[in-house]
A protein has these predicted regions:
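Membrane-embedded segments
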Residues: 88, 97, 102-128
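Extended, well-folded interaction surfaces typified by the phenylalanyl-tRNA synthetase beta subunit core
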Residues: 137-154
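Bacterial N-terminal signal peptides
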Residues: 11-21
Length: 285
């Protein structure tokens, strides 16, 4: 006669507790994700530039030499937004620039920077996006030239200009510098605008943060060569209040970044960003 296994109440509770603990550990922190979403500037690209537009419901236009891209609806609406996505779908989009169906995203979506976001931060961002009120506003289709509509060509572009993978700390750098590097390189994706690009839209990595162009206008050099007249205090105040040391104001695009993103960061994170910019190689404009 076979003996049946006997489970004590303590054993059952232990198994249940362990399963709960594993599940809880995998859940993101929506409150922390809210801060990360500000640091990543999500609202700027995913909210239409008009008064009363629903936040994160898409419609914001991004004009490029390849056509006009529109930020999609990223609210949890199951039809218009990303309500049917899984957490894995979201992480794949951010880390690898791929849609749930496996197709490439165009690199107007800055996954070339977001790929560096650490996985626990991605989970927190996902938890925050799921907590948003859903909007049924449909995403607008991109308006691109015929040749640039072919998503399969992005595979070649990725081979040339995209290296997926989470941020790796700078060896020998201080904790503050590494925190600043993470904010600048990954979440803040500063290089997307402040690094020059070639005719294919690929970033010129040897000129990282040495200045670029947006809408045909020059974007400043953020290396020590471009910031040599700015004190640390000047930089931090600019990122909060939007005023240069000589009393001037930034472009409309940068003013929006300050309003939506950098002014929402903690003083410690702002100081870390400045600390990182100070240790970059000085590159001429």
């Amino acid at each position: 006669m076979k003996r049946k296994p006997r489970w004590s109440g303590a054993s059952v509770l232990a198994v249940v507790f362990c399963a709960f603990a594993v599940h809880a550990a995998a859940q993101g922190d929506a409150k922390r994700g809210s801060y990360l979403a500000k640091a990543a500037g999500c609202v700027g690209c995913h909210t239409e530039a008009k008064e009363g537009a629903p936040a994160f419901a898409g419609g914001r236009a991004l004009k490029t030499p390849f056509g006009t891209f529109y930020g999609p609806n990223i609210t949890p609406d199951p039809k218009a937004g990303i309500g049917k996505w899984s957490e894995e779908d979201f992480i794949r989009a951010m880390r690898h620039g791929r849609r749930p169906d496996g197709a490439n995203y165009f690199p107007a979506f800055p996954y070339t920077s977001f790929t560096k976001i650490r996985e626990n931060d991605l989970r927190d961002l996902w938890a925050y996006l799921k907590s948003l009120p859903p909007s049924s506003q449909p995403s607008r289709p991109h308006q691109l030239g015929f040749f640039y509509r072919w998503r399969f060509l992005v595979t070649l572009w990725k081979w040339l200009y995209f290296t997926p993978g989470a941020f790796v700390s700078i060896p020998g750098a201080t904790e503050a510098v590494n925190r600043g590097a993470y904010l600048v390189q990954a979440l803040g994706h500063c290089g997307e605008c402040h690094t020059p690009r070639n005719f294919l839209g690929g970033s010129r990595s040897s000129r990282y943060l040495a200045g670029g162009k947006v809408d045909g206008k020059d974007v400043p050099n953020l290396t020590p060569a471009g910031l040599k007249k700015w004190s640390d205090r000047d930089l931090q105040q600019f990122l909060v209040a939007g005023m240069t040391p000589d009393g001037d104001f930034p472009s409309e695009t940068m003013a929006e970044v300050i309003n939506n993103t950098t002014s929402k960061l903690t003083p410690e994170d702002l100081a870390a960003m400045v600390a990182y910019l100070r240790v970059l190689p000085a590159l001429p404009d």
